Amino acid sequence: MTLDDNPVPPTLPYTLHGVFQQNVLDRPDASAVCAWDGDLTYRELDEKSSTLAHILRHRGVQDGALVALCFDHSLWTAVAMMAVSKAGGVWFFLEPKHPVNRLRQMCRSVQARMVLCSRSQASVAAELSDDQMEAPLSIEEAVLREEDPGPMDLEVVSPERPAYVAFTSGSTGSPKGAVMTHQAAVTGVLHNAKPMQLDRTARILQFASFAFDISFLEHFWALLLGGCLCIPAPLDRQNNTIHAVQSLQVNWMFLTPTVARLLEPPQLPSLRTLVLGGEPVTQADLDMWLPYVHLAGLYGPAECAVGIAVQPDYSRVESANNVGPPFSVACWIVSEQDPTQLAPRGAVGELVVEGPSISEGYINAPEQTTRAYLTNPTWLPAARHSTKKLYRTGDLARVLDDGSLLFHGRKDTQVKINGQRIELGEIEYHTRAVLGKEHLRSPPVVAEAMEVRGRALTVIAFYQVEGVCQDLDHDGQDLFLPPDDGFVGRKQSYQSQLRDHLPEYMIPTSFIPVRGLPLTMSGKTDRKTLREKFAQLPSDRIKAYFVDGDGGSRSTEGMPTTPLERQMQELWAATLKLELEEVGRNDPWMSLGGESLAAMRLVARARKEGIAVTVPDIFRHKTIATLCQHVSVRPGPETIESFPPFSLVQCQQGSTGIEELRHAAAQQCGLTPEAIEDLYPFTAMQEAVVIPPATIGVNYTLRLDVKLPAELDLEQLMRAWDMVVAANSVLRMRVVRLPADESETMVLAVTRPEIPMEPLFAERFAPGVDLWGLGKPLVRVGVAPGRLVMLIQHALYDGHSLGLIFRDLEQAYRGQPVAAVSYSPFVHWSTEWQDGSNKQQYWREKFAGFDGRVCPPRVADAGIGCMESQHFWGSLNFRPDGFTVTSKIRVALAVVLSWHFDTCDIVLGGIYARRGAPIPGIMESPVPASAILPDRIRLDPTQSLRANVDQDQENILTMMPYEGIRPSQVLDLSEAARAASQFQTILAVQQDNSSVYPEMFRDHEMGYYGPVTAHNLMMQCFLSPDRASARVSLRLSERTMQETTAWDRFLAHFEAVVDAIQEKPEIPVDRLRQHLGA
């Protein structure tokens, strides 16, 4: 590598506030900050920061004094940064959410003069100050109280002076702070601006945590280049990023790939440029974003202002590991073993960087500086020798022919988790200290970042146990000691103690006891062998280390002991898609990933084998060992009860004879009486989606557009559809109105198979128009080469059955037989309520004492127009913690509704799958079983989130045997029940059923005609297949949006409460709002 092809970029000798001041002069009235708590022009930001700089000078902030900034994400952060710079001080960020002990250590390590804070963080700032520091200063009070001091001389600060300190994780147990000068920061910003598509038109999202050096780069990119810094509210930033981007009209943002993967590119039309960085980029990231935005990349540690290399355009590279060329530094590749030797050209080695944007070293840490920085190494040409240090990145890379860098990983124990750089040594230091309190001396500890059995990258701590034999077997199986009875309690204690010193992302998820730590030939800890041996453990051994204390204990020795337990183990494994050895007799259902829908599948499988078990049984008895004590076993196969045609409506129609009913139905359908095979009364599903359209114009029609494989035979597909229709009586149902003794009633008529596929039809349907009418088929299917379009009324399907219809269609297309589908057993089960006085009593008691207040309030003149809605999207992440996903969602929604409407007694319409009904084969039958039923969540504000979620889970289990009721029957039970039935909130928690669709039909899109619901608020949570995350859809009627305020933050509040349930479940409900700052 020659000097000509590895030049050092020129230094730009300016201060941060000097460059900012030029933007003030050039465009004073342009937007500088657009934040949730206010906007500032460049002139206003200049004035406020000058006022604060004057105040800080009077408090002794000048000549390099260190000032800690402790803020929420708000406009005041920009004011504070610029003010400290103008005053001549040096600032550094504190992340208020981190442990106070860690923040205090940071302040002491740099001998901070004072803490400058927002009003909301004054209590944290007070805990950090000591006798050596000035009293904390609240920025809002200081700026609003003081007079404008007038112009200040900005030339007193030299560009060579320090501007800020960037803290990163340190291997000695404390964070280390890299000192960055004004000219280093300015040089990095200005040299890297063009390749990152940055200019004064940029509206930049301030997203990064203050623990991440990108947070202050986001400020620089906007304020030094004349753009606008866009700062969302804290809850929106964390939980509703898509809404934040659109509401602030963000067109440029930096994200880690992990965060970017949570977003939906089509939902961000304002976004022009996305820059990825902080962790490795994958080809999947490129595939996801390149069709929608200009995608660039930024690579580099905090020790290099604004990074080392920029990938200007990912659409032009062959590998996602190509991080681009350097723009603000010169790069050298040295030997991985010896930094005094250059690596051969084109070889992989450690990356060393040289140039004006490199930090000055670590503040008050000369030993760490010496290890990480080089001064005039022998391979550096004499012409380049200076007092400026070179930085050893610890990253392995090689230089391509075009000057780009190809990233090859790390050479040390520094890792990144979710974009956050951590030193494993810092975790080891604090873990040793915590374990030392329990042992005679601190044991050896090794922390590793690993992906184990599909878990996300996480930190695991291995520690050597004293007093055990350290002789290891050949394959290392005996290296790891199995968990004992106190394992879970110790793990939770260690984690609790570490939270006083480390942020959450650095807390180990498990602490693995080992007989001894493997060593290399040179006597160092053999980390590679340790990782490999652990990953090779049997699955039941590994899972035993990740118990979360959810009401049971996973036993590595607890294999089934009886024939029934072994039979149940096979059923659990098949249902949860686990290996037999992964399911022990003492493993709790939920700890294995079991949820309510999976429980329904288990019930169906068990019935086929003669085991009578219910969904409540599974959740209440938790483990195979206890469950098998409460189930009954019957000999012989399960039989399906049959019902003669027309028998299910005769009791409703009184003295009207069968033939009279057939003739009435046939006349409305335009068929002969012989074509009417049966008549069914409405179930709860049909009652909810057929009767309302006559009065409010919601037709509940789904449009499913399928992209068919080019080679598919349309004639064969049409024949297959005829077979499916013939086998499935549900698809042949039509709505008819029949005479009763004193009135008319609407029922469903099952007709002969006369619903063929048709050529692709032109669709010209106005919103709110009834597409079907009495006596007409309720499904239409049109086909053309490469495309199938289905229109189907909700009376014929639910979220579970639709995929099963296409499963049957694929089987018929391939010449396989299609099982006949009878709806009568389910209809009979749902109509048994006529004589169920004890069941009706359950519903009376459920709503006893309800005061009639529904939320949002019911719209009096509910017509088609007022049902137009606003649509918002969000996302959730879940962790195994002993709570069902459904109850987390339900309680979180109830909590947020209680904040908006000042009531803890919430009624809503829940969509219930009802696949736990005692009907053979119900899980695999393509019949519409679900129902919208009124439900009630009574929050106890004095109790913890945990107690409220536990109560909700029990309420759901108690309700399951009573789900067969129809909404009209609830209305007649009591005045309170009638009032609750006027609910205006709908909640649907839906499993991702995409895997049910055969491959030939999997490429499809769904949509609805007209308004989706007649209710004011509808929330749908679409769970991922592993139930570890969910996409959230929130629809609000226009009338509700107009009459009620603060809906823009509703979804963010909801997501924050779900997080709180998982992270801090002991918080009382009545203290949660203050805790979240909502």
Curated annotation (Swiss-Prot):
It comes from the Eukaryota. It catalyses: holo-[peptidyl-carrier protein] + L-proline + ATP = L-prolyl-[peptidyl-carrier protein] + AMP + diphosphate. Disruption phenotype: Abolishes the production of aculenes A and B and accumulates aculenes C and D. GO terms for biological process: amino acid activation for nonribosomal peptide biosynthetic process; secondary metabolite biosynthetic process. Residues 699-1013 are annotated as: Condensation. It is an enzyme of class 6 (ligase). GO terms for molecular function: ligase activity; phosphopantetheine binding. GO terms for cellular component: cytoplasm. Belongs to the NRP synthetase family. This is Nonribosomal peptide synthetase aneB. It comes from Aspergillus aculeatus (strain ATCC 16872 / CBS 172.66 / WB 5094). The lineage of its organism: Eukaryota, Fungi, Dikarya, Ascomycota, Pezizomycotina.
